Regions:
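Active-site beta-alpha connecting loops in nucleotide-dependent enzymes
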Residues: 47-49, 321-323, 340-420, 466
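N-terminal leader/targeting and accessory segments in enzymes
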Residues: 1-91, 95, 391-392, 396-410
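Phosphate-binding loop of NTP-binding sites
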Residues: 8-10, 88-222, 226-234, 439, ...
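Acidic, Mg2+-coordinating active-site environments of NTP-dependent enzymes
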Residues: 72-76, 181-334, 359, 366, ...
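Short acidic-hydrophobic, aromatic-tinged amphipathic segments that line or gate anion-handling sites
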Residues: 80-84, 422-432
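Peripheral docking tails and interdomain loops at the edges
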Residues: 441-462
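ATP-dependent carboxylate/acyl-activation modules
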Residues: 107, 322-326, 450, 454-455
Length: 466
């Protein structure tokens, strides 16, 4: 467990202690309700709440100290007064990472970064020698909290996820992470409302990899190579090359590794080819996009010294996180749940995976139900993206689709243009809950988190996950 001295924290942050901490500080928390023993409370101030109002709760919760911008004499909790608690937390995370000696892998992407982060952490050996971002704590608060968990002398690898929604954010995150290696899973339309264009997204994602030293390695898919910021990284890049693509003629400085995916009923085979010969790996069945991300994780793990035998063993232990490509059997029918987030690329990838599963597991011609929550933060082109998705889906005669949310009409219009099934428009899940629950065939559920689509199929006893 890491240990932070009061002198060290004061030096890093430029702060002053009201009194010495009540015990050892081994980490930090920004929510007084979730404090663990030894965690100092960071009193953040936001538009919705002021952490200084919860110093008493932090004291009652056993916090050894707090980091504040305005000390409160009425709370008998040692307080480190700084100009800005958030900036202080970020400085602590950065300086602790700098001194740690751990190999830090940074991961970002328009889709799949959390699942890839979890998989890579597993391939590198998992706890206690490997730490990874918890959940999706990938922002200016979550990243330093993750870095502060590195235990010098014990943590060999830290796999840190970086998520952005506005221009310039990646530079700040990468400056804290200081990645020794880096992975970008995908460049695609996500957070366009703030980022403005795919080119801007590519530049932001590549910014994480620019912070990797020349002695390190970066990995990304062939799709990202089409964007100039990624071609600028050619000298130390590994590019995953799908079976239907070929390496560009001007890529002699870059290592392109062809990969092939073969999907069975329950498993996906990943074949990597190259100068070292063919290498095959097996994992539970995943989508094509996740298969590509697995190839990237395998390539990075190999570069970091993990042998193929260990990778194969650990791949066998992997399973998707809840609501991220999760396959369940509910009342005898196939249910595909991918409700954490949605953008055009991840939508198509998940639908393709569901259709393949439904074809192999359901009777021929069985009706399918697509519950489609809208994709948020796509900017002024949002109606077009939704209409294009609907047009691409091509419902069968017996199929049904439910479009939920702000762009439901545009999505429904696209579905009507290309498909033959029936389409329902709704604003929230409660309008269609009975319809979904009573549907007898395979069900696909995906959309942005704000629509709470996961509430249609809460986890219950007797529900099987695959």
């Amino acid at each position: 467990m890491p240990c932070f001295s009061s002198n060290q924290l004061a030096e890093w942050t430029g702060g002053n202690w009201s009194a010495q901490p009540r015990g050892d500080i081994n980490g930090f928390a920004t929510d007084s309700r979730t404090l663990s023993p030894g965690q100092a409370f960071v009193a953040l101030k936001t538009d919705r709440r002021d952490g200084h109002n919860f110093l008493g709760d932090a004291l009652a919760g056993g916090a050894p100290a707090a980091i504040v911008s305005a000390a409160r004499a009425d709370v008998a909790l040692p307080q480190l007064r700084v100009d800005d608690p958030l900036r202080a937390l970020q400085t602590i995370g950065r300086e602790h990472r700098r001194a740690s000696g751990a190999h830090v892998v940074g991961i970002t992407g328009s889709a799949g970064k959390t699942s890839t982060k979890n998989l890579l952490a597993l391939l590198l050996g998992g706890p206690p020698g490997v730490i990874a971002t918890g959940g999706n704590l990938n922002n200016f608060i979550g990243v330093p909290l993750t870095l502060a968990r590195i235990e010098p002398g014990s943590t060999r690898f830290a796999v840190v996820e970086a998520g952005i929604s506005e221009r310039g954010e990646m530079r700040g995150l990468a400056g804290m992470i200081m990645p020794d290696s880096g992975v970008v899973t995908l460049v695609g339309p996500a957070h366009l409302e703030q980022l403005g264009s795919i080119d801007a997204i590519a530049g932001e994602k590549a910014d994480l990899l620019r912070h990797v030293p020349s002695s390190g390695v970066v990995a990304f898919p062939h799709q990202a190579w089409t964007h100039e910021p990624f071609r600028d990284l050619a000298a130390h890049a590994i590019v995953a090359l799908p079976a239907d693509a070929s390496a560009p003629a001007d890529s002699e400085r870059t290592r392109f590794v062809p990969f092939f995916l073969e999907h069975g009923d329950t498993h996906t085979e990943i074949l990597l080819t190259g100068h070292a010969g063919a290498r095959s790996f097996r994992m539970r069945r995943v989508s094509g996009g996740m298969g590509q991300n697995a190839a990237l994780a395998i390539l990075i793990a190999s570069e970091l010294g993990v042998c193929d035998e260990a990778i194969r063993t650990r791949l066998g232990d992997w399973q998707p996180a809840a609501l991220r490509g999760e396959v369940r059997t509910v009342a005898g029918r196939l249910v595909y749940l991918d409700c954490y987030n949605a953008n055009p690329a991840s939508m198509r990838d998940a639908i393709e995976a569901f259709n393949a599963l439904a074809t192999s597991r359901a009777p021929a011609g069985a009706a399918r139900l697509f519950v489609l929550g809208c994709m948020e933060e796509l900017g002024p082109d949002s109606p077009r993206y939704h209409r294009e998705l609907g047009r691409w889906l091509r419902l069968g005669t017996a199929d049904r689709a439910i479009a939920i949310g702000s762009q439901a009409e545009a999505l429904a219009a696209g579905l009507a243009e290309s498909g033959k099934g029936s389409v329902t428009v709704a604003q929230d899940v409660e309008e269609v809950r009975d319809t979904v629950i009573s549907f007898a065939g395979p069900v696909f559920v995906k959309g942005s988190r704000r629509y709470r689509l996961e509430t249609l199929f809460p986890v219950e006893a007797g529900v099987a996950a695959h």
